[in-house]
């Protein structure tokens, strides 16, 4: 899957909630009510990431989960990152 241009990424970000393009990655901070909700979200992410064979970098801080998406093989953001970002936004709704 080819790496997207900055212009393509900027256009795609218009359709995503609170994602940003930073240091060559898509980044979003998900905020939840508590630690249990954060872990519930993580447990929902795993099968989705496995189904796409595309795994995000995740940092957990009590009620926050920071997600970094990039396609390492392509050296930047691809359509696969955008697809996973959309799916993570859908999962977020299920936790709240």
Curated annotation (Swiss-Prot):
Q: Which domain of life is it from?
A: Archaea
Per the record, the GO terms for biological process are: tetrahydrobiopterin biosynthetic process
Tell me its EC number(s), please. 4.2.1.96
The reaction(s) this protein catalyses:
(4aS,6R)-4a-hydroxy-L-erythro-5,6,7,8-tetrahydrobiopterin = (6R)-L-erythro-6,7-dihydrobiopterin + H2O
- Keywords linked to the UniProt accession: Lyase
Q: MF terms per GO, please? A: 4-alpha-hydroxytetrahydrobiopterin dehydratase activity
Q: State the SUPFAM superfamilies in the record.
A: PCD-like
Q: Which residues form a coiled coil?
A: none
Question: What's the family?
Answer: Belongs to the pterin-4-alpha-carbinolamine dehydratase family.
Q: What is this protein called?
A: Putative pterin-4-alpha-carbinolamine dehydratase
- Please give the organism: Metallosphaera sedula (strain ATCC 51363 / DSM 5348 / JCM 9185 / NBRC 15509 / TH2)
């Amino acid at each position: 899957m080819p790496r997207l241009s900055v212009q393509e990424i900027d256009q795609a970000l218009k359709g995503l909630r609170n994602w940003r393009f930073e240091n060559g990655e898509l980044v979003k901070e998900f905020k939840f009510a508590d630690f249990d909700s954060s872990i519930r979200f993580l447990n929902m992410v795993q099968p989705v990431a496995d189904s796409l064979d595309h795994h995000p970098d995740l940092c957990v801080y009590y009620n926050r989960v920071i997600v970094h998406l990039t396609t390492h093989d392509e050296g930047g953001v691809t359509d696969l990152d955008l697809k996973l970002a959309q799916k993570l936004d859908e999962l977020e709704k299920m936790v709240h």
